[in-house]
Design a protein with these regions (language model features):
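Amphipathic alpha-helical segments of the small helical/lid subdomains adjacent to P-loop NTPase cores
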Residues: 1-22
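Accessory nucleic acid-recognition modules appended to NTPase machines
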Residues: 16, 23, 27-181
């Protein structure tokens, strides 16, 4: 047993990691400025670059819509990513290639359902039932609070200090998915 003080410090450091993430530019900005607002701006620039790349690879905008909807999808606590709620009228089989591309480019982590996890995943993987996670937990936090100008420092501070009243299970789910990749 490490004691409560050490546990609190380790959890705070872990939450700081969840906020900053592991993108080299975001980490460098935090080390340089110790300012979560500056880090958020760096991560927003990275999100914009991802979205530009998605448009180059898929000019329909579906990849961008799928990526931007990751936080909303995870917060629903559903067993799979619901394509039609991210892109009205769309179906999983029609975006399978886009989802695979996002996974291969490591901009997102895709966890496919398996019909029988006791045998090789490739044999039982269900390409139409999956969850999509952000590849970086810091990017996920920026996506989740993207609707606000500089993800109000209040949100960052509350999340860092474990004082945010929202259920953050989906943030932890994303960070665990990142760790398992």
């Amino acid at each position: 047993p490490l004691g409560d003080a050490v546990h609190r410090r380790m959890m705070r450091d872990f939450r700081l990691y969840m906020l900053v993430g592991g993108m080299p530019k975001a980490v460098a900005e935090y080390i340089k400025t110790n300012n979560l607002g500056a880090v958020d701006l760096v991560k927003r620039d990275i999100v914009s670059l991802y979205e530009e790349d998605f448009w180059k690879l898929d000019n329909t905008g579906r990849a961008t819509a799928l990526y931007d909807a990751i936080p909303a999808q995870l917060s629903k606590n559903a067993s799979r990513y619901q394509i039609a709620s991210a892109i009205p009228g769309e179906r999983a089989e029609r975006v399978a290639g886009i989802v695979k591309m996002m996974n291969n480019f490591m901009s997102a982590n895709v966890a496919y359902h398996s019909n029988d996890p006791n045998v090789g995943l490739a044999l039982t993987m269900d390409n139409e039932r999956f969850k999509i996670y952000a590849s970086d937990t810091g990017m996920f936090v920026t996506l989740a609070f993207k609707d606000k100008d500089f993800t109000d420092n209040i949100i960052y501070e509350k999340l860092l200090n474990d004082k945010l009243s929202a259920n953050l299970g989906y943030v932890y789910e994303n960070v665990i998915a990142q760790m398992l990749r």
